[in-house]
């Protein structure tokens, strides 16, 4: 079981999450600079969050992944901070290319940066890409013999990014999205509310033939998703 979180109350919830069977945690950290972190999140909690992360790593077997949006203004500085952070920690930090949605077009065109910059740096400095498992997510992960942790890249604008997509998204309203950027959603709330596993499986299987082959981000079509926080991705 995996949870995505901003880590704001990590210490408070960690014990309960362990009891519930949590085995993977994804936390968003878009900057390791406390000032920039506060500007982005509105909370001056980065030192506490990093301390809580170290406690999690020292006291649990939970697999931890950190995510950050790749922004043009901070890309290189953030990469240097990430390299220091994963040096001795069993953590994968994933850079995610900034994706356009209907509410961020101006910021997107000002700050979008290709993941190729990160990839080139890693390959030039002895990092090696890892083979993806068939059930893995969209990140390409890189490892280095001198580092305990790893660095990942999620590049939705890269060619063939959608070819191996194995993801469905379910919103808190019980709507299935076959793609983060599609133009429709499908209601499965009744199956979830009633614990109807067979009905849910049948419904999901019936949707597979119409799952889009690819998104249309390069055509500036981000679908119905006004903001990625609506779906948690």
Residues covered by each model-derived region:
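Radical SAM/AdoMet-radical enzyme domain recognition
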Residues: 1-94
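Auxiliary Fe-S-binding modules of radical SAM enzymes
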Residues: 84-88, 98-233
């Amino acid at each position: 079981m995996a949870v995505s979180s901003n880590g704001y109350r990590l210490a408070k919830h960690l014990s309960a999450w362990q009891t519930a069977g949590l085995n993977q945690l994804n936390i968003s950290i878009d900057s390791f600079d406390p000032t920039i972190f506060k500007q982005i999140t509105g909370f001056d909690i980065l030192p506490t969050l990093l301390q809580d992360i170290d406690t999690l790593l020292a006291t649990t077997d939970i697999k931890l992944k950190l995510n950050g949006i790749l922004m043009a203004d901070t890309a290189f500085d953030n990469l240097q901070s990430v390299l220091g952070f994963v040096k001795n920690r069993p953590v994968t930090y994933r850079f995610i290319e900034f994706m356009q949605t209907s509410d961020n077009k101006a910021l997107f065109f000002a700050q979008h940066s290709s993941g190729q910059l990160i990839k080139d740096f890693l390959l030039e400095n002895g990092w090696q890409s890892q083979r993806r498992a068939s059930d893995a997510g969209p990140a390409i992960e890189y490892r280095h013999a001198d580092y305990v942790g790893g660095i990942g890249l999620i590049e939705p604008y890269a060619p063939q990014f959608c070819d191996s997509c194995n993801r469905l998204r379910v919103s808190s309203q019980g709507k299935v999205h076959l793609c983060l950027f599609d133009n429709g959603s499908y209601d499965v709330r009744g199956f979830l509310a009633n614990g109807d596993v067979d009905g849910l499986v049948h419904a999901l299987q019936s949707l597979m033939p119409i799952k889009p082959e690819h998104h249309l981000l390069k055509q500036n079509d981000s679908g119905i998703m006004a903001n990625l926080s609506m779906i948690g991705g």
